[in-house]
Regions:
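Broad, structure-driven detector of short, well-ordered beta-strand segments within folded domains
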Residues: 106, 116-144
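Feature for intrinsically disordered/low-complexity regulatory segments and propeptides
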Residues: 1-54, 58-65, 69-77
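A general secondary-structure signal for short beta-strands and their flanking turns/coil
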Residues: 46, 50, 99-103, 144-150
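Short, hydrophobic/proline-enriched secondary-structure or compact coil segments at domain edges
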Residues: 142-160
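Conserved small/polar residues in nucleotide/adenosyl-binding loops
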Residues: 171-172
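Ser/Thr-rich, low-complexity intrinsically disordered terminal regions
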Residues: 58-114
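TRNA-recognition modules of translation machinery and tRNA-sensing kinases, especially anticodon-binding
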Residues: 168
Length: 174
């Protein structure tokens, strides 16, 4: 039997499944508002953060397959348009409702960049985390915006046991 290993075109990045909702970039763009500081200056939108990291990885790893990001969000904040401030929540029309997610995590793989260690395939994985509550949006002026970005190797395992192992360190990328 000949086994030919081919890169997986779309490998999902399962992470943070508990207490989060899967969303798409399109949903973030069309269904969520961008929060503002107290002086009404916009923050950087979650979808802009994701697109920036994805575009940077695509540019840096030009010629490689860069999968679409898997996005998880939590802590939805619901609001309303200024025109509907006097209405009860039950009387709001859909066009008068607003929402955004306070917390965001995303990750995507680059399956054409991989290493094999002890028979396990490790794919390169890039992602980020953001939390609007770290920003203190009630400040009177715009403050620093915080973002967390990570890059590392992802290994797929299937086990129903507690796992331990030795760390692997590489000083070069393929």
């Amino acid at each position: 039997t000949i086994v030919v290993e081919a890169p997986v075109v779309k490998s999902s990045v399962s992470f943070l499944d508990a207490n989060t909702n899967p969303v798409t970039l399109e949903e973030l763009t069309t269904q969520c508002v961008v929060p503002t500081w107290a002086n009404q200056e916009l923050t950087i939108a979650h979808q802009d953060f994701i697109s920036c990291v994805h575009d940077a990885a695509s540019s840096f790893y030009a010629g490689e397959t860069v999968n679409a990001p898997d996005i998880r969000c939590s802590h939805i904040v619901r609001g309303r348009t200024p025109q509907s401030l006097g209405k009860k929540a039950s009387e709001l029309l859909e066009c008068e409702k607003t929402q955004f997610y306070q917390r965001l995590a995303f990750a995507f793989t680059i399956p054409t960049i991989y290493e094999t260690v002890n028979g396990q395939k490790l794919e390169l994985c890039v992602g980020g985390v953001r939390n609007y509550s770290d920003l203190n949006l009630y400040r009177s002026t715009k403050g620093l915006e915080k973002f967390s970005v990570f890059i590392g190797w992802r290994v797929r395992i299937c086990s129903n046991q507690v796992l331990t192992g030795e760390a692997v360190s590489y000083t070069h990328l393929r």
